[in-house]
Amino acid sequence: MDQVVYHTDFPGLNLLKRGKVRDVYDFGDRLLIVATDRLSAFDVVMPDPIPGKGEILTQISLFWFDQVKDIVRNHLISSDVNDYPEACRPYAETLAGRSMLVTKTEPLAIECVVRGYLSGSGWKSYQKDRTVCGISLPDGLRESDRLPEPIFTPSTKAEAGQHDINISFDEAANIAGRETTEKARDLSLAIYRRGVEVADARGIIIADTKFEFGFVDGELILIDEVLTPDSSRFWPRDGYAPGGPQQSFDKQYVRDYLLSLNWNQKPPAPDLPPDVVANTRKKYSEALDLLVG
Protein backbone atom coordinates (compact mmCIF):
# COMPACT_ATOMS: atom_id res chain seq x y z
CA MET A 1 0.00 0.00 0.00
CA ASP A 2 2.79 2.40 -0.93
CA GLN A 3 1.13 4.26 -3.81
CA VAL A 4 -1.36 6.98 -2.90
CA VAL A 5 -4.06 7.40 -5.55
CA TYR A 6 -6.26 10.50 -5.28
CA HIS A 7 -7.59 10.23 -8.79
CA THR A 8 -6.75 8.15 -11.84
CA ASP A 9 -5.85 9.22 -15.35
CA PHE A 10 -5.50 6.33 -17.77
CA PRO A 11 -5.00 7.51 -21.38
CA GLY A 12 -6.68 5.12 -23.77
CA LEU A 13 -9.35 4.06 -21.28
CA ASN A 14 -12.87 5.51 -21.39
CA LEU A 15 -13.55 7.31 -18.09
CA LEU A 16 -17.29 7.01 -17.48
CA LYS A 17 -17.48 8.95 -14.22
CA ARG A 18 -15.70 9.99 -11.08
CA GLY A 19 -17.75 9.23 -7.99
CA LYS A 20 -16.97 10.46 -4.51
CA VAL A 21 -14.41 7.69 -4.03
CA ARG A 22 -14.36 5.55 -7.19
CA ASP A 23 -13.29 6.22 -10.76
CA VAL A 24 -15.27 4.13 -13.25
CA TYR A 25 -14.09 3.15 -16.74
CA ASP A 26 -16.39 1.84 -19.46
CA PHE A 27 -15.68 -1.37 -21.37
CA GLY A 28 -19.04 -1.86 -23.06
CA ASP A 29 -20.94 -4.47 -21.06
CA ARG A 30 -18.29 -4.34 -18.34
CA LEU A 31 -16.95 -1.64 -16.04
CA LEU A 32 -13.58 -1.19 -14.38
CA ILE A 33 -14.12 0.27 -10.91
CA VAL A 34 -11.06 1.79 -9.24
CA ALA A 35 -11.24 2.60 -5.53
CA THR A 36 -9.09 5.67 -4.96
CA ASP A 37 -7.85 6.96 -1.61
CA ARG A 38 -10.37 9.81 -1.63
CA LEU A 39 -12.59 10.18 1.41
CA SER A 40 -16.03 11.77 1.52
CA ALA A 41 -17.83 12.97 4.62
CA PHE A 42 -21.26 14.59 4.68
CA ASP A 43 -21.33 13.81 0.93
CA VAL A 44 -18.36 16.13 0.29
CA VAL A 45 -14.99 14.85 -0.95
CA MET A 46 -12.09 15.76 1.31
CA PRO A 47 -8.97 17.36 -0.22
CA ASP A 48 -6.63 14.91 1.52
CA PRO A 49 -6.37 11.21 0.62
CA ILE A 50 -6.22 8.40 3.18
CA PRO A 51 -3.22 6.32 2.01
CA GLY A 52 -4.14 2.75 1.16
CA LYS A 53 -7.85 3.30 1.74
CA GLY A 54 -8.86 2.20 -1.75
CA GLU A 55 -7.05 -1.10 -1.35
CA ILE A 56 -8.61 -1.69 2.07
CA LEU A 57 -12.12 -1.01 0.75
CA THR A 58 -11.56 -3.33 -2.19
CA GLN A 59 -10.27 -6.21 -0.06
CA ILE A 60 -13.16 -5.87 2.38
CA SER A 61 -15.74 -5.80 -0.43
CA LEU A 62 -14.19 -8.89 -2.02
CA PHE A 63 -14.41 -10.65 1.35
CA TRP A 64 -18.10 -9.83 1.68
CA PHE A 65 -19.00 -10.66 -1.92
CA ASP A 66 -17.75 -14.16 -1.14
CA GLN A 67 -19.52 -14.31 2.23
CA VAL A 68 -22.96 -13.46 0.82
CA LYS A 69 -22.79 -15.08 -2.63
CA ASP A 70 -25.36 -17.68 -1.57
CA ILE A 71 -27.84 -14.88 -0.76
CA VAL A 72 -27.49 -12.69 -3.83
CA ARG A 73 -25.58 -12.63 -7.10
CA ASN A 74 -23.07 -9.79 -7.44
CA HIS A 75 -21.45 -7.89 -10.27
CA LEU A 76 -17.84 -9.03 -9.71
CA ILE A 77 -16.08 -10.62 -12.69
CA SER A 78 -12.50 -10.45 -11.42
CA SER A 79 -10.14 -8.44 -9.23
CA ASP A 80 -7.07 -9.97 -10.91
CA VAL A 81 -5.44 -7.44 -13.23
CA ASN A 82 -4.36 -10.31 -15.49
CA ASP A 83 -8.03 -10.91 -16.31
CA TYR A 84 -8.65 -7.29 -17.30
CA PRO A 85 -8.83 -6.06 -20.91
CA GLU A 86 -5.46 -5.66 -22.60
CA ALA A 87 -5.77 -1.86 -22.55
CA CYS A 88 -5.48 -1.95 -18.74
CA ARG A 89 -2.07 -3.62 -18.69
CA PRO A 90 0.02 -0.40 -18.72
CA TYR A 91 -1.75 0.62 -15.51
CA ALA A 92 -1.48 -2.72 -13.72
CA GLU A 93 0.66 -1.36 -10.89
CA THR A 94 -1.92 1.28 -9.97
CA LEU A 95 -4.88 -1.07 -10.45
CA ALA A 96 -3.54 -4.01 -8.45
CA GLY A 97 -5.42 -4.44 -5.18
CA ARG A 98 -7.76 -1.47 -5.61
CA SER A 99 -9.87 -2.35 -8.64
CA MET A 100 -12.55 -4.72 -9.88
CA LEU A 101 -13.77 -5.68 -13.33
CA VAL A 102 -17.55 -5.95 -13.02
CA THR A 103 -20.69 -6.53 -15.04
CA LYS A 104 -22.40 -3.31 -16.10
CA THR A 105 -25.88 -2.98 -14.59
CA GLU A 106 -28.74 -0.50 -14.53
CA PRO A 107 -28.33 0.88 -10.99
CA LEU A 108 -31.31 0.98 -8.66
CA ALA A 109 -32.33 4.61 -8.12
CA ILE A 110 -32.33 4.39 -4.32
CA GLU A 111 -29.76 3.71 -1.61
CA CYS A 112 -30.63 0.66 0.48
CA VAL A 113 -29.81 1.43 4.12
CA VAL A 114 -30.21 -1.08 6.95
CA ARG A 115 -29.98 -0.02 10.59
CA GLY A 116 -29.53 -2.46 13.43
CA TYR A 117 -28.60 0.18 16.00
CA LEU A 118 -29.75 3.74 16.64
CA SER A 119 -27.06 6.14 15.47
CA GLY A 120 -26.33 9.04 13.13
CA SER A 121 -29.29 10.47 11.23
CA GLY A 122 -31.46 7.65 12.62
CA TRP A 123 -30.82 8.82 16.16
CA LYS A 124 -31.56 12.44 15.21
CA SER A 125 -34.84 11.41 13.61
CA TYR A 126 -35.82 9.24 16.58
CA GLN A 127 -35.27 12.13 19.00
CA LYS A 128 -37.78 14.24 17.04
CA ASP A 129 -40.74 11.88 16.78
CA ARG A 130 -39.71 8.30 17.69
CA THR A 131 -39.58 7.31 14.02
CA VAL A 132 -36.87 6.60 11.44
CA CYS A 133 -37.88 6.89 7.77
CA GLY A 134 -41.52 6.54 8.75
CA ILE A 135 -40.93 3.45 10.92
CA SER A 136 -42.21 3.80 14.50
CA LEU A 137 -39.78 2.66 17.19
CA PRO A 138 -40.31 1.96 20.91
CA ASP A 139 -40.05 4.76 23.47
CA GLY A 140 -37.01 4.98 25.70
CA LEU A 141 -34.27 4.03 23.25
CA ARG A 142 -30.85 5.60 23.77
CA GLU A 143 -28.21 6.61 21.27
CA SER A 144 -26.40 3.47 19.99
CA ASP A 145 -29.04 1.10 21.38
CA ARG A 146 -29.62 -2.09 19.45
CA LEU A 147 -32.99 -2.03 17.70
CA PRO A 148 -35.51 -4.82 18.36
CA GLU A 149 -35.09 -5.85 14.70
CA PRO A 150 -32.98 -4.41 11.87
CA ILE A 151 -34.94 -1.88 9.81
CA PHE A 152 -34.77 -0.94 6.13
CA THR A 153 -34.47 2.83 5.78
CA PRO A 154 -33.85 3.84 2.16
CA SER A 155 -32.52 7.16 0.95
CA THR A 156 -32.19 9.10 -2.27
CA LYS A 157 -28.95 8.94 -4.23
CA ALA A 158 -26.92 12.14 -4.12
CA GLU A 159 -24.25 13.29 -6.53
CA ALA A 160 -20.94 14.55 -5.15
CA GLY A 161 -21.57 17.69 -3.12
CA GLN A 162 -25.24 16.87 -2.56
CA HIS A 163 -26.76 15.15 0.47
CA ASP A 164 -28.64 11.86 0.52
CA ILE A 165 -32.17 12.31 1.88
CA ASN A 166 -33.79 9.67 4.08
CA ILE A 167 -37.15 8.58 2.66
CA SER A 168 -39.95 6.23 3.67
CA PHE A 169 -40.53 2.82 2.10
CA ASP A 170 -43.52 4.21 0.18
CA GLU A 171 -41.44 7.09 -1.16
CA ALA A 172 -38.76 4.61 -2.25
CA ALA A 173 -41.45 2.48 -3.92
CA ASN A 174 -42.63 5.55 -5.84
CA ILE A 175 -39.09 5.98 -7.17
CA ALA A 176 -38.07 2.37 -7.86
CA GLY A 177 -41.39 0.51 -8.00
CA ARG A 178 -42.99 -1.40 -5.13
CA GLU A 179 -42.03 -4.92 -6.16
CA THR A 180 -38.42 -3.91 -6.78
CA THR A 181 -38.23 -2.00 -3.49
CA GLU A 182 -39.61 -5.02 -1.61
CA LYS A 183 -36.98 -7.24 -3.25
CA ALA A 184 -34.22 -4.74 -2.41
CA ARG A 185 -35.45 -4.54 1.18
CA ASP A 186 -35.51 -8.31 1.61
CA LEU A 187 -32.05 -8.75 0.11
CA SER A 188 -30.64 -5.86 2.16
CA LEU A 189 -31.94 -7.30 5.43
CA ALA A 190 -30.66 -10.79 4.58
CA ILE A 191 -27.18 -9.50 3.68
CA TYR A 192 -27.06 -7.33 6.79
CA ARG A 193 -28.02 -10.24 9.05
CA ARG A 194 -25.29 -12.39 7.51
CA GLY A 195 -22.82 -9.55 7.90
CA VAL A 196 -23.73 -9.06 11.56
CA GLU A 197 -23.22 -12.76 12.25
CA VAL A 198 -19.83 -12.92 10.54
CA ALA A 199 -18.55 -9.61 11.95
CA ASP A 200 -19.68 -10.35 15.50
CA ALA A 201 -17.53 -13.48 15.52
CA ARG A 202 -14.60 -11.21 14.64
CA GLY A 203 -15.28 -8.57 17.28
CA ILE A 204 -17.08 -5.99 15.14
CA ILE A 205 -20.61 -4.61 15.52
CA ILE A 206 -22.09 -3.45 12.21
CA ALA A 207 -24.42 -0.73 13.45
CA ASP A 208 -25.79 0.23 10.05
CA THR A 209 -24.83 0.00 6.41
CA LYS A 210 -25.74 0.99 2.88
CA PHE A 211 -26.09 -1.35 -0.09
CA GLU A 212 -26.43 -0.66 -3.79
CA PHE A 213 -28.14 -2.89 -6.32
CA GLY A 214 -28.44 -2.94 -10.09
CA PHE A 215 -30.39 -4.79 -12.75
CA VAL A 216 -28.81 -7.13 -15.28
CA ASP A 217 -31.10 -9.16 -17.54
CA GLY A 218 -34.00 -8.35 -15.24
CA GLU A 219 -32.26 -9.66 -12.12
CA LEU A 220 -31.48 -7.44 -9.14
CA ILE A 221 -27.86 -8.02 -8.11
CA LEU A 222 -25.47 -6.57 -5.53
CA ILE A 223 -23.08 -3.92 -6.85
CA ASP A 224 -20.57 -1.27 -5.73
CA GLU A 225 -19.05 -1.83 -2.26
CA VAL A 226 -20.30 -4.10 0.50
CA LEU A 227 -20.08 -3.68 4.29
CA THR A 228 -16.98 -1.47 4.25
CA PRO A 229 -15.97 1.27 6.71
CA ASP A 230 -17.10 3.76 4.02
CA SER A 231 -20.60 2.34 3.68
CA SER A 232 -21.12 1.19 7.28
CA ARG A 233 -20.69 2.04 10.92
CA PHE A 234 -18.26 -0.47 12.44
CA TRP A 235 -17.96 -0.48 16.22
CA PRO A 236 -15.61 -2.61 18.34
CA ARG A 237 -17.73 -5.17 20.20
CA ASP A 238 -15.48 -4.86 23.24
CA GLY A 239 -16.34 -1.58 24.89
CA TYR A 240 -19.79 -1.24 23.34
CA ALA A 241 -21.73 1.01 25.72
CA PRO A 242 -25.11 2.33 24.53
CA GLY A 243 -26.23 5.75 25.72
CA GLY A 244 -23.85 7.81 23.61
CA PRO A 245 -21.52 7.71 20.59
CA GLN A 246 -19.27 4.66 20.15
CA GLN A 247 -15.67 4.17 19.19
CA SER A 248 -15.53 3.11 15.56
CA PHE A 249 -13.45 1.60 12.76
CA ASP A 250 -14.92 3.89 10.13
CA LYS A 251 -14.93 7.49 8.94
CA GLN A 252 -16.90 8.66 11.97
CA TYR A 253 -13.51 9.82 13.28
CA VAL A 254 -13.32 12.28 10.37
CA ARG A 255 -16.96 13.31 10.78
CA ASP A 256 -16.34 14.08 14.45
CA TYR A 257 -13.30 16.20 13.57
CA LEU A 258 -15.27 18.11 10.93
CA LEU A 259 -18.14 18.71 13.36
CA SER A 260 -15.65 20.40 15.70
CA LEU A 261 -14.99 23.03 13.01
CA ASN A 262 -17.07 25.94 11.82
CA TRP A 263 -17.72 24.30 8.43
CA ASN A 264 -21.09 24.42 6.64
CA GLN A 265 -20.70 20.91 5.16
CA LYS A 266 -20.56 22.28 1.62
CA PRO A 267 -17.61 22.26 -0.81
CA PRO A 268 -14.81 23.06 -0.51
CA ALA A 269 -14.00 20.80 2.42
CA PRO A 270 -11.33 21.84 4.93
CA ASP A 271 -7.89 20.24 4.96
CA LEU A 272 -7.44 17.25 7.25
CA PRO A 273 -4.53 17.44 9.72
CA PRO A 274 -1.89 14.69 9.39
CA ASP A 275 -2.96 13.06 12.66
CA VAL A 276 -6.58 12.79 11.48
CA VAL A 277 -5.40 11.21 8.21
CA ALA A 278 -3.10 8.78 10.05
CA ASN A 279 -5.68 7.78 12.64
CA THR A 280 -8.36 7.29 9.99
CA ARG A 281 -6.05 5.02 8.02
CA LYS A 282 -5.30 3.08 11.20
CA LYS A 283 -9.01 2.53 11.87
CA TYR A 284 -9.63 1.26 8.33
CA SER A 285 -6.62 -1.05 8.63
CA GLU A 286 -7.91 -2.42 11.94
CA ALA A 287 -11.25 -3.23 10.33
CA LEU A 288 -9.51 -5.10 7.51
CA ASP A 289 -7.29 -7.03 9.92
CA LEU A 290 -10.21 -8.07 12.13
CA LEU A 291 -12.48 -9.10 9.28
CA VAL A 292 -10.12 -10.67 6.80
CA GLY A 293 -7.06 -11.41 8.93
From Swiss-Prot:
InterPro entries membership: SAICAR_synt/ADE2_N, SAICAR_synth, SAICAR_synthetase_CS
UniProt xrefs under Pfam families: SAICAR_synt
Keyword Nucleotide-binding: yes
UniProt xrefs under PROSITE patterns: SAICAR_SYNTHETASE_2 (PS01058)
Record flagged with keyword Nucleotide-binding: yes
Pathway: Purine metabolism; IMP biosynthesis via de novo pathway; 5-amino-1-(5-phospho-D-ribosyl)imidazole-4-carboxamide from 5-amino-1-(5-phospho-D-ribosyl)imidazole-4-carboxylate: step 1/2
GO cellular component: cytoplasm
Recorded GO MF terms: ATP binding; phosphoribosylaminoimidazolesuccinocarboxamide synthase activity
GO-annotated biological processes: 'de novo' IMP biosynthetic process
Residue ranges the record marks as coiled coil: none
Record-given protein name: Phosphoribosylaminoimidazole-succinocarboxamide synthase
Record organism: Desulfosudis oleivorans (strain DSM 6200 / JCM 39069 / Hxd3)
Higher taxonomy: Bacteria, Pseudomonadati, Thermodesulfobacteriota, Desulfobacteria, Desulfobacterales
Encoding gene (name): purC
